Design a protein with these regions (language model features):
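Glycine-enriched, solvent-exposed interface loops adjoining structured elements
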Residues: 1-229
Length: 229
């Protein structure tokens, strides 16, 4: 269970031997307490930016396709999608079974499919078979859907701002110490304490590497890529 914004701030304040924040005063604090709030935000943002595919940022989206519409926007806080996961859901009423979409480049859609999709107008063509990155902030399907099919896919979320005392970070609470080290680094930088900030930065970087080792650098098999001559 991730820790709340208030809990993280108070952990940092205890490390500094400063007065903790009362929840009712959280929105209006000043001085060092306000600096700690900013430092915790910066620490959370840095961890989220360190990797595209943190497992704790994994999410799943369900969209209902619109007849005759090929392109759609990403959900809020979207970072990166798993294009292998896009699947039309089975629906006996629509006469469709589970269908995994094949990824194509946007240029391929432009060259081979867009004209037919656009020519179909508001009627669409059939069950989509392809998925592609749209121009801008979204994705596209082809052929143009002729019914309101349900599409599911998996993606990773970006950093979402924390503002209220009860907001949570999505980062597991077992790594609160990493967040605290990051907050101390930013706090000491605010205060121009270079020696203390450097020590906290090193601890913060080690903590991020530990997170990467645990969650990212985890291979189930190794493939030999040597070429035989």
């Amino acid at each position: 269970m991730p820790s709340t914004y208030l809990s993280l701030c108070n952990q940092v304040l205890r490390r500094l031997n400063e007065v903790e924040i009362i929840e009712g005063d959280f929105a209006s604090v000043l001085g060092v307490q306000a600096l700690v709030k900013d430092a915790v935000k910066a620490s959370v943002a840095k961890i989220n930016q360190a990797e595209f595919e943190w497992p704790f940022n994994a999410a799943e989206e369900t969209d209902t396709l619109v007849v005759g519409q090929e392109e759609y926007t990403w959900p809020s806080f979207y970072k990166i999608a798993d294009f292998n996961s896009f699947q039309i859901q089975e629906d006996t009423a629509l006469g469709v079974s589970f269908t995994t979409l094949k990824y194509i480049e946007r240029d391929e859609w432009y060259k081979k499919h867009r004209d037919n999709d656009y020519a179909s107008g508001a009627d669409g063509i059939s069950v989509p078979r392809y998925i592609f990155p749209s121009h801008g902030n979204g994705y596209g399907v082809s052929p143009s859907p002729d019914k309101a099919y349900t599409l599911k896919f998996r993606y990773y979320q970006n950093y979402s701002d924390i503002t209220a005392a009860s907001d949570v970070t999505r980062i597991p609470d077992s790594y609160d110490t990493v967040l605290v080290d990051g907050a101390l680094y930013h706090l000491y930088m605010f205060k121009d304490n270079l020696e203390a900030s450097q020590a906290s930065f090193m601890a913060f970087e080690r903590g991020i590497k530990d997170l990467q080792t645990l969650y990212i650098n985890n291979y189930e098999y190794i493939r030999d890529t040597r070429v035989k001559y």
